[in-house]
Amino acid sequence: MKIAFFDSGIGGLSVLHHAMRVLPKEQFVFYADEDNVPYGVKTTDEVKGFVQQAFDFLVGCDVKAIVVACNTATSVAVREMRHRYDIPIIGMEPAAKKALDLDGEHRVLVAATPITVHGKKMQILIDRFDKDHLVDLLPLPRLVEFAEREEFRSEAVHAYLDQELGRFHLADYSALVLGCTHFNYFKDTMREIMPENMHFVDGNEGTVRELIRQLDARHELEDLPQTVDYYYSGRRVEDPAELARIARYLKRLDFVYDIR
């Protein structure tokens, strides 16, 4: 049986990319809801409806687990999906706790989509772990749009990030938490703007580690040739141009993977 990765668009490829490195004997399904991206500026009810449609499709594919490789979908819908479907469902959370644990003295900046930044789940997370009030939140909605059109290194991207990150005195911060899977594509540009003392933290490693833990507990880890099937909003991706597009995103992730 295969492992499904679900995202509003191509951001979730960053989580799949890490899983492909550490689970070379597994077979995967990647579902990008390209018809409805971006989720971060939609209403909560709209996102819940999109997620349920995707889950109905993926469960029909007889997958053994679903990784919600989307912070927005996790914050809005993952609890409800766990009640609805009887398979392991692993969500993404902004790794604010991890960032605080790494330092504990300097400030932490969490970048995410507006719906994640302003959501109840984020507030609960901050209330639980940010006892010293060291966390600041930064919505970056345009990064999702830039990523979806493969615009990673343009003057517009640099100007946008320079403006938004420039709202903060970054020398006071130890970490930038990438609270949206689309944001990993921009690590090189962000690195140019950030001071040396500031590093990246994302939830990809922890999410895949939790996936492995749950599958191991169920004795469902495989020893098969690695494959990936790609779907856009329920339609299998077979067009060579679209497969080449996905390959370009994965190549981009190879390039930024080791940027800290």
Residue ranges and their predicted role:
Residues 1-260:
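Non-catalytic structural scaffold of enzyme domains
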